[in-house]
Structures are given as structure tokens and as C-alpha cells.
Amino acid sequence: MKKIVISSLCLLSATMVFAENMKEASIVNANDTSRVIDLDEVVVVAQPKEGVRLRQQPMSSSAFGMQDMQTLQVKSLGQLADYVPSFVMPQYGSRLTSSMYIRGIGSRLNNSSVGLYYDHIPLMSKSAFNTHFYQLDRVDVLRGPQGTLYGGNSEGGIVRIYSKNPMNYQGTDVSLGLGMGLGYGRKAEVAHYHRPSDKLAFMVAGFYNSEDGFFNNTNLNEKNDKIDEAGAKVRLMWKPTAKLTFDLTSDYQYTIQNGFPYGAYDADKDETADPSTTFMNTYRRQMVNTGLTVSYDLNSYLLTSTTSHQYLWDRMKMDQDYVPTDYLSLQQTQKMNAVTEEIVFRSKNASRWQHATGIFGSYQWLHIDAPVGFGQGMTDMLDAMMQRVLPATHQMTFANFRVPGDFRTPQMNAAVFHESNLHLSDRLMATLGLRFEHHQIKNDYLTTALADITMTMTIPGRPAPTVMNIPYESKFESSVKKTSNQLLPKFGLTYRLCEDGSNIYAVVSKGYLAGGYNFQGFSDIFQMEMRSLGANFPRDGKVQHTADDQAQKDQQISYDAETTWNYEAGTHLNLFDHKVKADVAFFYTQIRNQQISRMSADYGFGRVIDNAGKSYSCGVEAALRGQAFDNHLMWGATYSFTHAKFKEYDDYDNARNLISYKDNYVPFIPQHQFSVNGDYRFDVEDDILSSITLGFNVKGQGKTYWEANNDMYQKFYATLGAHMMFKLNKVEVDFWGRNLTNTNYHTFLVNSQMTNQSFAHQGNPLHAGVDLRMHF
């Protein structure tokens, strides 16, 4: 941290010296008129559900335009999260891992508790969240439950991403990038926008990204985090009349990468080794998201329909023990198709009553094939385990042990909602909303434990041992269904303090995260079953299960819906004649049946979701941004404190002893987060060079606990970044550096009960590069 402060001061000093010596630089006007304008006023995007600007609503939010993201050197949603209070999207594992946490609420597996909308399309699979978003116009992050307008799985908040509108933006964009040193990478992106008439506009775009990776697998002598990805996007907008608009978009992406570079962590030395696995962990993904938005202007009202089809196929191959000895492997393939439809009718005039009413429906088909394989290290453990319960005259050995699993989990959602903003006076606005949501998930599964067993029996009096080859088989097959109905209300008050738009607000809202079924825990279930059979192992190797056995397993893999009540008060302030924007919020959230991701209890064969009884989260968020010196200086700062603890949560250890996690911190939630950034532009009177921009950013977070027992944690850390941009006629050349202090930190840590070790994903070390952007 001390290095970061010193580096920041040096950078600021250099900036001031450079400014003093720049004879061609603009002279600062003593009567500076820099004003920070709400992004809603500058980057106007279609809003089917909302007629009130973000900072006039009773909620905490952050909005970023294209220029903001370039200034902050943001290339992904995870990097953007560093500049949003209470929001974290740790970058670890692979493109598959896309967990998002807001205000202590998040989910590592299955459904997300933070929703993601891309050009009005609600992305249905969390596996599609960690992707390459490009040609963006604006990104909004809405914090706190957004259930009234956006439904279940938005209890933490909503991220809304908007790409550039070809009706408003024309020309060709070319972006090239080169990463230097560690993690050497290349990127290319091209987009063309054309508007042949007032009624028709379109865009076509494509990209390619490649990174060599930072972490070398010492057992395989290959980078464990290299990635190649490419994609293309088209968008077509047609306005046959002044009132009717069709907006069609389709985005295809392909990813191939080495992933999950988890190295052994030594807590005593606070050191993490490079990854070393039996085989290379890999991830492949293809996805296509297509959406059609049709809007009709009814003068005082707006009618909007958004229809989408989403396709995702991916395959993950993982060495789940993370060591060179072959214990356990998982090859998971999933295929998802989803369709969504939403129709919204809202007012668009400036009357005292502004309202939105809508219906939503979705259906998702998901097929997961997840065979688990047991290597020699695991079969040796099984042999020893069985030998402890068998007579000395018997010996049992396992070979070719595997657990194939086939899971089909269709989901259906249906909802109706309404939200009103009532202007009770010139200064006071009441927000009232209610949503009824029906959710249903089904799980048709077939999973079997298979192995080739050799039983050797030495019988006194016989000249040779008796050898029996037994084909082991234990099967569970079932079809289960879970249904829930939820009412999601919202009550808010907003009071305008003065004519500049500053206001205070208070809001109460409910959110929920749908329940579901685990599929990674069956390997643990079969191991427990085998241990309990012991000497009663069936002679023919076929384990029979009763109806009660099956019902018990159905219950064992099930987890319930999570619900939250959020209480929040805050303010949106426009200070010093709009030169500074300040947003502050205080929140308290009650959580029931919180869904906690943990390793399977006995052997740690995969992660499962469990329900904690009760927990809570409270904290404060603050964000400042401003401009000065005739808009030459742009700066921002954020801070958040999140206190998330269990009130009731009991579990069992390996010895089946009851453990209480009451008053322990909820894992994966940073207690503190902050960011500071600044950019200063020096104007140059030159025929070729028009300006030079120097910028820096500092961001940090911690303490973050990794497990519910709070034994392991990431202490608070911070990283420093900087960039220098040269703006030519139609070209921008931007030199950048990240983690310039080479801070050591972890983005993820997992404990393996199989090997009694901890494994961590290290944060990226110091790296730098250059970007070239052209528009013509």
C-alpha cells in the first residue's frame, strides 16, 4: 500500500511538472465553468421500463459512458466492478466463472443473484455473463433488489449494458491492442455503422482476442491461463414510421482457453505456487444471443416488446484435485437454449403519475453431461478404505472407477408487474411497485457409479486364492420438480432538496433467488455409500436402492429459494454548480435461506449449494465524480463498507460433528472497497497532435474470507494503474499499465479435503500494453 501511495504522488507530481512546462497547454480559466452532466442527459438509450432518470429514482446506481470506460482502461465487466461501490466480480478460473456480488449478496453456482441485460435482452445463463462486451455506449449498475421491474435473480442488483445505436452513430471504428511482457496479448476489433436512410441503419462488428497467459503449469510446461476468442455482431434498426421501431441484434462468440490456474497455497508463508496438474484444465464455449425489440410510440405512452433466443454450448475439463497425482477429474458439457418475451406499457409524458406495467415469460432448456473420473490416487485410497473394513483374508481393488451423470433441468418463469412514480408535490415523489412471479424448475437425472472390482479371497486349506471380478454398479434415477410463487413489492420516497436536482430518498424492497438442484455432489454421495456398505458389499456388485433411498437423495441435492428484504436511505447531490456529483447510500439487508457454495462435505468432490438459515448485510456506499479546469481534469472516487454475517447457519465437519457458523462472515464478500482515478488533458496547438492525456487509478479491496469457517482470507490490498494517451487527428494511441506495484493477491481460494491442501488463483502481476483506436 505504501508503494502505491508513493507511486501515485510521483505520478501526480510528474503531471504537474509536465503541465508547467507545456507552453502550448491551455491556460486555466479562473472562471472555470466545468459541469458534470448526468449520463442520462448525454448518452440517451431506450428505456422500456423507466421514465425517470437514474439519479432521480430512490436507488443507488452507477452509470458509465464509452469515454468513462476508455479513461478507466476497462476491458471487461470484472474490471468495471472495481469502480462501483459494493460490487465485485472476481476474475478467476475461466470464462465459465462469472460470479457477481453486490452488497454481500451473490451466488457462485447455478443461478445468479445479479441480473445482466445486454441491449434489453435478459441473459438467462450465468455461464454467458463473463464474455467480451464491445462497441458499448453505456453501462448501468443498479444496486439493491430490482425485483419489481426485473424479477427473480436480481436481488443483489442489475447490470444493464447498451451498445452503440447505429441510428445515432455512424462511421468505422478500428481498435488494435498489444500487451507487452508477462501475459503477452493481442486484440483486434472492427465495427462499421451505416445509416443509408432516415428509416434504416445497421452495424456489423467483429473481434479477436488472444493472451499468452501469466501462470505456467510446472507439471505440463504450458501456460495455464492462455485464451483465444473471437466473435461477430450485427445490429439492424428499422423505422418504417415515425412511431414504430424494430431493433434486431445478434451476437456470436467463441472461446477456447486454458483455465483454472490454481496453485498450492502455503498459509504459513503466505506464498502460492504455480499450478501443477495431471492434465491441462480447459474450457470451450460457443454462444449466440439474438434479440428483437419492437417499440410503438403512442404519443403519451410507449409500448415495447422484447423477444430473445439464447444458445450456449460449453465444455469444461478440470483436474479437480489440482495436483500432479491423478485423483479426480470432471468433464462437464452443457447445452442451453432459452427463449424470453417481455411486453411493457409505460407512460412517457411529464405528468404527476408515471407508470409502467408489463408481463414477462421465459423458458430454458438445459442439458448437463458431467462424468466424473477417479484416477489411480483415488482408487488407492478406496482400496485402503475397503481393506480397513474387510477381513484379513479378503482383498478388494478398484479399477476404471467413474461416475457418469446426465442432468436435464428445464426452467420456466412467468411474471406480471407494475411500478408507479407519483409526484405528491413539486418536491416529493412516491415509488410503488409490485411483481408476481412464478418459477418452476425440473430435474430429470440419471447418475451411476461404475467400477471394475477385483476381490481376492485367501481361504485356509486351499492351494490358491479365489479371485472374483465384480462389475460394481450403483444407480440413482429420478424426476423431481420445484415450484415457487413470489410477491416482490417496492416502496420508495424521493424528496428533491433544491432546483439543481439534489435529493434524498428512502426505499424498502424485496428480492429473491430461485431454488434448484445440485449435480456435483453425487460423487461424494457414492463414496459415502461405499464406505457405509463395507463388508456388506453385494456379491454381484449391484447396489439396490429403495424408494426411501431415492427420496433421501432427491432431498439431499435440493436447495431452497433465497429471499431478501432491503432497507435503504441515501442522497444524490449536485455540488458546486454541478461541478461535483456525490452519491451516498446506507443499507441493511435481511437474508433468509442464503444460498452458500461450499465443497462437498466428506471428500470435497465438487461444489454444492447449501442454504444458511439467516444472515444479514449492512453497509455504506459513496461515490464522487467531478470535472475541473474547463473540463481538462476528470476525476472520481468510490468507497464502500459491507458487513455481511451469518445469524443462523449450522453444518457438519468430516467427523459428522455439528458446527455453528453464527456470527461468521459470509465468504467471498470484501469488507472494504475503494477506487480513486484522475485524468488530465493537455491541449496542444499542433497540426497532427491535438492533446495528451495523463491518467492514473488506484483500486483496492479486502478483507475477504474464502470459507464459512473464516479460517482463510485475503487481506486488504490495492493496485496502481496508469495510462498516457496521445490524440491525433482521427487516431488515439494509449499506453497503459496495470498493477504497476506488482501487488501479490488472490482472486479465489479453495480448500481441498481430498488432499488437505488449499489452492488459490493469483491476481495478474504487473503488465502493460498499448491500444490504438481509429474512427473514420
Regions found by a protein language model. Give the residues of each.
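Periplasmic N-terminal gating module of Gram-negative TonB-dependent outer-membrane receptors
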Residues: 32-43, 52-98, 105-119, 129-143, ...
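Outer-membrane beta-barrel translocator/receptor signature
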Residues: 112, 125, 134-137, 143, ...
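Periplasmic-side early beta-strands and strand-to-turn transitions of outer-membrane beta-barrels
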Residues: 168-170, 177, 191-279, 312-325, ...
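Solvent-exposed loop segments that connect transmembrane elements
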Residues: 216-222, 260-276, 321-328, 371-404, ...
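Face-selective signature of the C-terminal outer-membrane beta-barrel domain
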Residues: 239, 244-251, 286-314, 330-453, ...
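Membrane-embedded beta-barrel scaffold of Gram-negative outer-membrane proteins
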Residues: 293-318, 503-507, 520, 526-610, ...
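Gram-negative outer-membrane beta-barrel transporters
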Residues: 356, 426-430, 579-591, 608-707, ...
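C-terminal beta-signal and adjacent terminal beta-strands/loops
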Residues: 512, 699-707, 725-776
